[in-house]
Curated annotation (Swiss-Prot):
TM region(s), chain numbering: 3-23, 32-52, 78-98, 108-128, 130-150, 161-181, 206-226, 240-260, 273-293, 308-328, 330-350, 368-388, 403-423, 450-470
CC per GO annotation: plasma membrane
Oligomer status and interactors: May form a heterooligomeric complex that consists of seven subunits: mnhA2, mnhB2, mnhC2, mnhD2, mnhE2, mnhF2 and mnhG2.
Superkingdom, taxonomy of origin: Bacteria
GO biological process, one term: ATP synthesis coupled electron transport
MF-aspect GO terms: antiporter activity; NADH dehydrogenase (ubiquinone) activity
Name of this chain's protein: Putative antiporter subunit mnhD2
NCBIfam families from the UniProt entry: PRK12663.1
A Pfam family of this chain: Proton_antipo_M
């Protein structure tokens, strides 16, 4: 396969975003462009993933400049799983909204900046060096800053200030980590960094750099440093809340998985217990949040925080099963959290309220939502045969192999609390008493029900056909847990380029 195809998943959304600037007045044409572009992007990413699973990873050196001197993209099973899932959910998100009922500014500019954000996300998954990872993070964050602040309410502006400030601090830490690492090893290419870190005997320097990256990426993933997330997500409209929940924290978690399996595996006795500790704190924060709030958007926001704790617990176990579970659960959670925020946003749209006490009788009026809600709860809880089950079982196994029984117990307890918080909403939807206050539910557009139906089908399919998905995530785990395998791929490519 031509390695130049690897640039398409990032190039298509970028070009489409630029074209939309000139077609914003033509709503129908714009919709065809951005939905069509992301649909094609999903198909291309899936084809690249299938090729990689059947053959070998793809590397692309831009301008013919071989790494570590040039910009390099790496399409392996981990990056392409994430790119495929991300492209798929962005397609659904952009199909879900932005109709004539939207505010003029939102209708004109949201799709453009969503595509810019998608460009940064996909670039973060594909890049093979730290500086370009930083560049992609900044593209993603700048677009997200616009999306968060593109509102007219005081509540949204307040949430935007917190979001922007904390993410800028995280970016500074990321840049600081890059500077310290370059000073230590003299390169930023992933494979070169991995090789040279193994030769460094200054343990304190490596540990300090590792901790800087943990905090930097942890702030992006809402790992302990969660303050920006609930307020920001709660004030966004349905499409943006789903987009942020699906992708923003996942990029930080992806970076942690890449760094602490491929690069910083020299001092696992320090870094990985820290990751486990932070994951446990994050799970507790998420659990308290889902129980404490009656605002269903904030309940959903804390569900995002809780799931990040699960992913990092698997990574922190430093076992094959744990890392495999983290990767599977991360990919699955992109889809499940999209579904969660679509459902929550639809409930707010139909009832006009964010507190679940106003949802009394809705499930009886809209039985489809009752079914979709149950599927979502079981997927989040990791109940077989739903899609959350394989990932959680592997994370459980990793925690047991690592002897981390406290983390295991916390994961079980917080998973039950997560399910309880959602069953509480479901119970109100079926059996709640509105105490005489009648709420007239607005009908949900048919195309939005169709998209929810697609997500329900995908969640069920990922659970039932889990071995197919696990083939890709297991391959990704082998790649990231085996330094020699990764180096042999990159080095063989470099030799071919020098011939």
């Amino acid at each position: 396969m031509n390695s130049n195809l690897l640039v398409l998943p990032i190039l298509l959304p970028l070009l489409c975003a630029l074209v939309l600037v000139f077609t914003k007045e033509k709503n129908r044409l714009s919709k065809i462009l951005y939905i069509g572009t992301m649909s094609v992007n999903t198909v291309i990413s899936l084809c690249l993933l299938i090729y990689v699973l059947q053959h070998k990873p793809i590397t692309l050196d831009f301008g013919g400049w071989a790494a570590p001197y040039g910009i390099q993209f790496l399409g392996d099973s981990l990056s392409l799983v994430m790119v495929t899932v991300a492209s798929f959910v962005v397609t659904l998100i952009m199909s879900y909204g932005f109709g004539r009922g939207e505010d003029r500014v939102n209708r004109y500019y949201l799709p453009t900046f969503i595509l810019f954000l998608t460009t940064g996300v996909i670039g973060s998954f594909l890049t093979s060096d730290l500086f370009n990872l930083y560049v992609m993070f900044e593209i993603m964050l700048l677009a997200s800053f616009v999306l968060v602040t593109l509102g007219q309410s005081v509540e949204q502006l307040r949430a935007a200030i917190i979001y922007v400030v904390l993410n800028i601090v995280g970016s500074w830490l990321f840049l600081l980590g890059i500077g310290l690492l370059y000073k230590t090893v003299g390169t930023l290419n992933f494979s070169q960094v991995a090789l040279r870190l193994d030769q460094i005997h200054d343990n304190k320097a490596i540990i300090i750099i590792s901790i800087v990256f943990i905090v930097a990426f942890g702030s992006k993933a809402a790992l302990v440093l969660f303050m920006w997330l609930p307020k920001a997500y709660a004030v966004l409209n349905t499409e943006l809340a789903a987009l942020f929940a699906a992708l923003m924290t996942k990029v930080g978690a992806y970076a942690l998985i890449r760094f602490f399996t491929l690069l910083f595996d020299q001092h696992t006795g320090v870094t990985h217990p820290l990751l486990v500790f932070m994951s446990c704190i994050t799970m507790l924060i998420g659990a308290f949040g889902v129980i404490a709030y009656r605002d269903i958007k904030k309940v959903a926001s804390y569900q995002v925080i809780l799931s990040i704790g699960f992913v990092i617990l698997g990574l922190g176990s430093n076992t094959f099963a744990g890392v495999h579970g983290a990767i599977f659960y991360l990919a699955n959670d992109i889809i499940v959290k999209t579904m969660l925020f679509f459902i929550i946003g639809s409930l707010v749209y139909m009832s006009g309220y964010r507190e679940y006490k106003y949802l009394c009788g809705l499930a009886k009026k809209e039985p489809f939502f009752g079914v979709a809600f149950v599927v979502m709860i079981f997927a989040i809880g990791g109940v077989p045969p739903f899609s959350g089950f394989p990932g959680k079982v592997l994370i459980f196994q990793g925690a047991i192999e690592n002897g981390n029984f406290i983390g295991l117990a916390l994961m079980i307890i917080t998973s039950l609390l997560a399910m309880y918080s959602l069953f509480r909403i479901l119970f109100i939807m079926y059996f709640g008493d509105n105490d005489g206050e009648q709420v007239d539910f607005n009908p949900l557009p048919k195309h939005r029900k169709t998209i929810l139906g697609i997500l329900v089908a995908v969640v069920l399919a990922m659970g039932i056909a889990a071995p197919v998905v696990m083939n890709a995530t297991e391959n990704a785990t082998k790649l990231n847990m085996d330094d020699n395998y990764f180096h042999s791929i990159v080095n063989s490519h470099l030799k071919e380029g020098n011939k």
